[in-house]
């Protein structure tokens, strides 16, 4: 009984909004008539005690079904038989037993978790998201326009710079040629006049001029005169003749290179021959010096031998004279 009352108290405290489950407990005693008729049943009353449970499971039903269940209460009877006899139950729903635990007050109830959001917050969040989307679209469009305009500006600037460079190059080249042309004409006129007046000039004056100019300057003047005459001749000739002359110049350069190689090869051979001849002459000189030394030594040796012989002969003559005198 105490356990069932505790369950009732626990269920009422746990359920806040839902209707609480009703647990009704009733005990009935056996009628005195049955006890008087059968003495064996009196002994079994304490052992075969029974109780009645009335439970309304409103938590697992819809609200309409809950209302129906509250209006119509079903009574379930449990019968316990002993010696094939049925004992009736007595309904004590009108007089529920009061337990000391029902007097206790339930503690304060707190809502620990709130998963639901208010409708106002959801509407405000939706409006914010829409505003953000519109602002992002506007920003992207502006960026695209700025990039296209900047690209066009850079392309136009590059084109203008290219045109300015080409115009600058053309203007500079024209100015350069306009400045060089009179100088070139003057130099050509001077060269032509000098070539015309040079044959009429007297040889004495030429010799004086040559005597006054050093030899190095003369060679430089000759080379410059040749190059100028060649350039002047090329300037007045047709392109076909120029090509022919360029080919001839290339051939002359090739032939001169071949001749130079031959000369260097022959020069190396001549140098080797000269080195050989010098080595042979040096060896001959060494041999001659050695032979002269040998002849000198031989003459010396011979003179020494002759002197020794003469000394021996003199000593022998002296000995003979001494013997004769004795």
Curated annotation (Swiss-Prot):
Localization annotation: Cell membrane; Cytoplasm, Cytosol
Disruption phenotype: Partial suppression of phenotypes observed in brx mutants such as reduced root growth and smaller root meristem size. Reduced sensitivity to externally applied CLE45 peptides in term of root growth suppression.
Tissues where this protein is expressed: Expressed in roots.
InterPro entries: MAKR2/5
Region (Disordered): 188-239, 267-326
Expression triggers: Strong accumulation in developing sieve elements upon CLE45 peptide application in a BAM3-dependent manner.
Major subcellular location class: membrane
Superkingdom field: Eukaryota
GO cellular component: cytosol; plasma membrane
Role according to the record: Positive effector of CLE45 peptide signaling. Post-transcriptionally regulated amplifier of the CLE45 peptide signal that acts downstream of BAM3 in the regulation of the transition of root protophloem cells from proliferation to differentiation; thus preventing primary root elongation but stimulating lateral roots development.
Miscellaneous field: Less stable in procambial than in phloem pole cells.
Protein name: Membrane-associated kinase regulator 5
